[in-house]
């Protein structure tokens, strides 16, 4: 696990205690207690529980990976619960001004419903949704099946069993190519070699291409690439000008660190004189417009990063902050962007109003 991730995680978890000030004040209003809670009155409690959690977190990180995974899961599941309670408390403050609520109804709204949402979200984060899309390309003579996975976030929660589940789906779907568009790990724990080993069980005729995302750059790209290079089945293409051609389709991979990805893509396309070919770009962040992609000669871009917002209210924020949020986007049938909402999760192991997604994209010629 990268030290930067530890610092970030602990700051985030410590900050979550301040949400308790808001929550406790709302609950004290519902339960009609007299004491008003302020950050100052909780100051020592915040420090006490922060020290306890930090001690457990650090001890398990140093001495027990299995205990660390349990503590990580509990800590960030709890953070998700606190976020859910905070959102319902905010909703309570709005609705109470419009509709009088009994004490019983208020308790249901601010306690029971958030707990049910949290349980549902934890379960939903484990259910894989296959999003199938069919794209017609007039100048293409054949057909190709692409399986797109992004944001696996291998680490404290998602480990070898997550990869095994993915490989099983890959072999069942039997695509021509699998593309992994970044964030294969999240820095929450060191990626062990045996976690990656199941990738070698992918059927022989299936190509596997990989590029990096922002998490690899933040928490140890070199170490991840070293592990990827040990897996013969995976071809890392994010840091070269190499074009991978599969069934008449050119695949271009660009790592997250190349912030001006469209410029790099144009250079690769021009260098290889493939402007009029069918080109597929793999890039982690969906921040390139369909128009710019079309001008560069890119028929399809595959991306991830957004997680579909993962949990409320971040689903709304991600939707507002990303022109290409999740799913397939069409530029009058000229070219396309497909954004995966991700296979893993970041921090809170939960999903609400979004899906654990694997994309199945078929490109075919017009009959």
What are these model-predicted stretches?
Residues 136-367:
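Soluble catalytic domains of enzymes that build or remodel membrane lipids, polysaccharides, and related
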Residues 1-126:
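Non-catalytic terminal accessory segments
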Residues 16, 28, 50, 55, ...:
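Generic serine detector
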Residues 71-74, 97-150, 155-173:
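N-terminal signal-anchor transmembrane helix
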